[in-house]
Amino acid sequence: QVSPGSKTSAMVEYVDVLPTFLEVAGGKIRKNLDGRSFFDVILGKKNSHKDYVFGEMTTRGINKGSSYFGIRSVRSENYKYILNFTPDVTFQNACTTSTIFKSWSKKALAGDNTAAEKISRYENRPAEEFYAIQEDPYEWNNLADDYNYAMHKAKLKRELLRWMKECGDKGQQTELEALEHQGRKRQSKDIKRAEDTG
C-alpha cells in the first residue's frame, strides 16, 4: 500500500508510533493512548500530521549525566523553542566523555576557537533557545532575545507550558523526582552519585 521511496516532512512523535503500528496491523486503537496514528501520512493521503511536536530530556540518573539538567522543547513547522531548567549547571551526558568530544576539548585547549565554541554551546545552555529552523536547521543562531521573533517565541512557550501541564510535568520538580521513578538498584546508585557530585 505504501509507494516505494516515499518521503514526508510531516511532524510526528514517538507516541504516534504505537497507534500507527496498531492501525497498520488492523488492530483497535485505544482512546487512552497518547499518540495518534500517522498511517494516512504513510499512505500519502495526508501531507501533515501535527501542528506541534514536543520533546523532553533529563540528565538525572542517566549514564555520565549531570546531577540534574532538564530540557523541554516544542517545534512547529517553522520554529523551535527550548526551555532549559538549570542554565547555571554544566550539561553533561555520555557524549561529553566520548572520543569525539575529547578531541574537541584537546583542540580547544590548543587554541582552536571553533572547537571551543562547540564545547561551550553543548555544555553551557541558556535558559531559553529559539530557532527559525527552516533557515537555520542546525540551530546555530539563538533568537530567544530577538525582539523580531518575540511573538513567535511566546506562542511556542505557551504551547509547551500547556503540554507540560497536560502531562503533569512540573518542570524542575519533576526532574528532581526522576530518581524515585527508576528501579531500586539504579535509584540507590544514582542517589549516591548525585549526593557525591552535589
Where are these regions (language model features)?
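Short, solvent-exposed loop/turn segments at secondary-structure junctions
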Residues: 2, 38, 59-62, 79-81, ...
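Substrate-binding rim/cap in mid-to-C-terminal beta-strand-loop elements of soluble/periplasmic
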Residues: 1-32, 36-51, 141
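Short conserved micro-motifs at the rims of enzyme active sites and ligand-binding pockets
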Residues: 65-68, 85-86, 92-95, 141-144, ...
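A generic secondary-structure signal for well-formed alpha-helical elements
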Residues: 24-29, 42-46, 78, 83, ...
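Active-site rim elements
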Residues: 2-11, 25-30, 59-70, 116-119, ...
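Core domains of carbohydrate- and sulfate-ester-processing enzymes
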Residues: 79-116, 181-198
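Residues that flank catalytic or metal-binding motifs in active/ligand-binding sites
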Residues: 13, 34, 50, 70, ...
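Long, internal low-complexity/basic segments
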Residues: 112-128, 133-198
